[in-house]
Amino acid sequence: MDSLSLLELNSLVRRSLEQCLPDEYWIQAELSDVRSNTTGHCYLEFVQKDPRSNNLVAKARGMIWNNIYRLLKPYFEESTGQLFTSGIKVLVKVTVQFHELYGYSLTVLDIDPAYTLGDMARRRREILLQLEEEGVLTLNKELEPRRSRLHRK
């Protein structure tokens, strides 16, 4: 019976992925477990959740090399007014990598802040609609304004 070592199998997987997925891909995902280290690289996880149940349906490790991260992070934060952190949805350009020791990962090359802004606007509309349906959206408008001590006569 012929057999392969684990390294040989992983090398075969790497070469196959390089041949089948040689391009860059734009993917939509939610950021999870975003952290940077002393070298300036950013390590994170990309997740996708089922919209109905909120259960995870896909997950991948990702990284952003420091030469990209030091440009991408401020660009994203200035464009969106939001921190580059876990829990936000992003549209990123990635390459698929496979390393014999570390396994499958996605390397980030670029980001589209407009996608995140659109998602933030959608979530805001959903929250406002929910508050309106619950009858709490205009509760503060119905209160009489209170004068502060400085304005009392």
Identify the function of each model-found stretch:
Residues 1-153:
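Acidic, two-metal ion nucleic-acid-processing modules in DNA metabolism proteins
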